[in-house]
Amino acid sequence: ADEGDDFTFSACYDVYKSGNEAWNEQKKRFEPILYALITDMVFTQENTEVTSVTVPEMINRCGTQKAWIESNNGGAGFEKLIRKKIKAISEPFYQGANKESRIITNSASVNAQIIMPLGWEERFPKIHEHVTGFLRDFPANEHDDPEDGLTGIYEKELADGDTRPYSQATRGIKRRN
C-alpha cells in the first residue's frame, strides 16, 4: 500500500487447538480442529513510511512468533524493511494462487475457524464494515485486503492441521521423491 490505492492489512493472532477432532477427507484421518483468535489488526492506506513503524510495533506488542509477509509486489521490500524491527521469525511468501477463488473456496472455514475479539465492531470499525459487507461478486468490492489476509491466516496456520511449534516444524530431513 505504498503509492497505490491498496490497503495494508496485518493481523496478530493466537492459534488454539480444540479438544475435538474432525475427519480430514484428503488425508483420511481425524485431525484436531484449530482456531485463530485475532488479538490485533492494522488496516490502513498509509504509505510504507508509516506502516514500517506501525506493523512492527503491533507484531512486537502482541508477542508474535512468526510473521508471514506476502512478497508479491512491494511486499519483498517491506519484509526486508521490517525484518530488523521485529522479534518474530520473518517468513516472506509468494502468493500465486487466484485471490478470488481462494477467498470464496475458504470462506466457510475462515468464518468458522477465525475468531474475532469481543467488541471488534467498535475496536476495528473499518475492518468490521469491510468484512461483513463483502460481496461474493468481486467487481462489486472496491478492495479485498482484509478478506485476503484472513484467508491467508487460514491457509498458512489452520488448513493443514499442523499443531507443532514453529521451532519443531522446520526440523529434520524433508524427503521428496
Show which residues each predicted segment covers.
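RNase H-like, metal-dependent nuclease domains and their acidic two-metal-ion catalytic environment used
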Residues: 1-93, 117-177
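Short glycine-centered helix-capping/turn motifs at secondary-structure transition points
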Residues: 112-116
